[in-house]
Amino acid sequence: MLEKIIKQKKEEVKTLVLPVEQPFEKRSFKEALASPNRFIGLIAEVKKASPSKGLIKEDFVPVQIAKDYEAAKADAISVLTDTPFFQGENSYLSDVKRAVSIPVLRKDFIDSLQVEESRRIGADAILLIGEVLDPLHLHELYLEAGEKGMDVLVEVHDASTLEQILKVFTPDILGVNNRNLKTFETSVKQTEQIASLVPKESLLVSESGIGSLEHLTFVNEHGARAVLIGESLMRQTSQRKAIHALFRE
């Protein structure tokens, strides 16, 4: 599935026209996660669908969802902008950015031109996936994003990918995706297995498969300072109540 998505992205980039410059306030994604509202930082995701699960939320109003997340003290918001596989739109991110006061992460499959596009649509941070980009190219995009005033969440799915990246540079923010790319199954033990390789200066984020206070505590005990949660929140009627229930508040 990942290969299929990447192939589609390469086609999209060929015809990409950069949007007009718009004034957006800059917010620090890293600082928000480093000083969270709870014992662990929360990146709450605005996601309508996924390639593995199909449509997740029919009654999908991105701005209202984002406002609910902020009201429930999420530290940052992730917005899916990929259209073919996640039913996202760039406008969702821009609208969310204007509606909330916390940092916004663009979740997509980024190539060079999309780094500038991300800045123009209001992203405070972008996601770069280690399994998609070779380490040198990833580093180039990482530096480019930094020059444009954005933070970068560098995501890996396995230890070997992380080891290759660390030979080139040490990312400020490292995400371990708990989803096995071959089976698409999730396990928070993936964070445990990779955490020992994460440099102390990198802020560790655990992503995918987190749906309980026990999961939050487990990944936090193994070094995660933040989590990214999407589907388990999006499936609930009220995203605000879902966050409070997750933390048993």
UniProtKB/Swiss-Prot annotation:
Pfam families: IGPS. Pathway: Amino-acid biosynthesis; L-tryptophan biosynthesis; L-tryptophan from chorismate: step 4/5. It catalyses: 1-(2-carboxyphenylamino)-1-deoxy-D-ribulose 5-phosphate + H(+) = (1S,2R)-1-C-(indol-3-yl)glycerol 3-phosphate + CO2 + H2O. Keywords: Amino-acid biosynthesis, Aromatic amino acid biosynthesis, Decarboxylase, Lyase, Tryptophan biosynthesis. It comes from the Bacteria. The keyword Amino-acid biosynthesis applies. Its EC number is 4.1.1.48. It is an enzyme of class 4 (lyase). The keyword Transport does not apply. InterPro entries: Aldolase_TIM (IPR013785), Indole-3-glycerol_P_synth (IPR045186), Indole-3-glycerol_P_synth_dom (IPR013798), Indole-3-GlycerolPSynthase_CS (IPR001468), RibuloseP-bd_barrel (IPR011060). One of its GO terms (molecular function) is phosphoribosylanthranilate isomerase activity. One of its GO terms (biological process) is L-tryptophan biosynthetic process. Coiled coil: none annotated. Belongs to the TrpC family. HAMAP family: IGPS_B (MF_00134_B). This is Indole-3-glycerol phosphate synthase. The lineage of its organism: Bacteria, Bacillati, Bacillota, Bacilli, Bacillales. The gene is trpC.
